[in-house]
């Protein structure tokens, strides 16, 4: 078994480091990975290492606040008539939701004041992404749809701002 983890997101926590981790519980796989890593030398710079360690110091606090905020935002989204479906497993700060009227997506995104329209996820600030035009824009629409990435889907990365500010921002944008 191999686990790949993006340290760029929550572990770094401030959208300023690019890093990852590879883990395995198999000695033979570890030996192969270690050989490749040793011969190719993909290591973090000292500064990136510092940034990652800095982020780890506040990880528990950031995750607690992000999760708490996300749960409050989910309650709001589930009650909003502008939202037809909320996709949230119950933990963490990542929320996906489908809007009732996808033609309003540009208005929603452009009306947000607290959320930032950006692709990086897992930082201290709250972000909104539109996979159709951002992260998955190069994937044909029918393929995206087969993965559940429909054109009415928006993704939120919930940060550590006050939950009531996030909800008010979404409420305003979704009401337009």
Tell me what each language-model feature is.
Residues 1-82, 86-87:
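Conserved PLP-enzyme active-site core in the AAT-like
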Residues 20-22, 95, 128:
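Well-ordered beta-strand positions enriched in small/hydrophobic/aromatic, beta-favoring residues
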Residues 40-41, 112-122, 173-176:
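A common structural junction motif
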Residues 42, 75, 116, 122-124, ...:
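Positively charged, small/polar-rich N-terminal and surface patches that mediate targeting and assembly
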Residues 52-61, 93-100, 155-159:
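Short, well-ordered beta-strand elements within core beta-sheets of diverse protein domains
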Residues 62, 128-176:
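PLP-dependent enzyme catalytic core of the Aspartate aminotransferase-like
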Residues 71-119, 141-145:
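Conserved small-domain helix->loop->beta segment predominantly found in fold-type I
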